[in-house]
Amino acid sequence: MTEYTFDDLAVVMGTYNEEQAIGSVLADIDRITDGRAEVVCVDGSDDRTPEIARKMGARVIEQEPQGYGVAVEAAVLAPDRPVVVTTDCDDTYPMEYLPKFLDLINDGYDVVSGDRITKGAETMPRLNRAGNIAFARLASFLMGATVHDTTTGMRAYRRELLHDIEWTENTGLSAELLIRPAMRGYNIAEVPIPYRERAGETKLDPFAGGAAIGKSIVKVCLEERLRL
């Protein structure tokens, strides 16, 4: 089995008006990977986010704002490198876990998913935390297998998996990116990670967004059940 290094790693994200945080996120990726990882940002911003990202060496794909999932799907399918890590651009996720995620891919896992809930996620707004716990319980019930965090933005994937599955969701894409591989028998590892307070304002309405995510979880789980 091929032993992947940071030269085989792409870190991707959808970005939208994150000029307060993007520099810190990209600096962390560069520091942790010694500048060897490719960074891809699919961007729909009207602030300085794409300018900052380009100056820091990221590949920026500009896109009209069409929602979280449209941007992230474009981001995960863009790299040619064999290991793709998703993250958010709001500085909430610990880039120091990139080596551990890569090690687990090298151990044979197809998806490595950062679990924010197990460590407590005290910096997460209370309503968001309650919703994320509820989403994980709903998905676990419908899948017939326990998952702890279906909506985390930090995961590592084998590239071929991302191209072998057809993705259909927008707001609920993060949950779909875990549920479909899990229900198709891919090897999944969940890794408890710390979660930092976000830099800048959230763009997601917790009620409308939460309803869309819940609907996606039910839809995707039922579709995967019907495939079996």
Curated annotation (Swiss-Prot):
Keyword Coiled coil found: no
EC number: 2.4.1.-
Reported phenotype of the disruption mutant: Cells do not generate the small monosaccharide-charged dolichol phosphate species.
SUPFAM superfamilies: Nucleotide-diphospho-sugar transferases
Glycosyltransferase recorded as keyword: yes
GO MF, one example: glycosyltransferase activity
Source species: Haloferax volcanii (strain ATCC 29605 / DSM 3757 / JCM 8879 / NBRC 14742 / NCIMB 2012 / VKM B-1768 / DS2)
Cited InterPro entries: DPhHxTase (IPR054887), Glyco_trans_2-like (IPR001173), Glycosyltransferase_2 (IPR050256), Nucleotide-diphossugar_trans (IPR029044)
Alphabetized UniProt keyword annotations: Glycosyltransferase, Transferase
Name the record gives this protein: Dolichyl-phosphate hexose transferase HVO_1613
Role noted for this protein: Glycosyltransferase that adds a monosaccharide to dolichol phosphate, thereby being responsible for generating one of the three monosaccharide-modified dolichol phosphates. The subunit onto which additional sugars are added is not known.
Taxonomy, superkingdom: Archaea
EC class (word): transferase
Coiled-coil region: none
Family: Belongs to the glycosyltransferase 2 family.
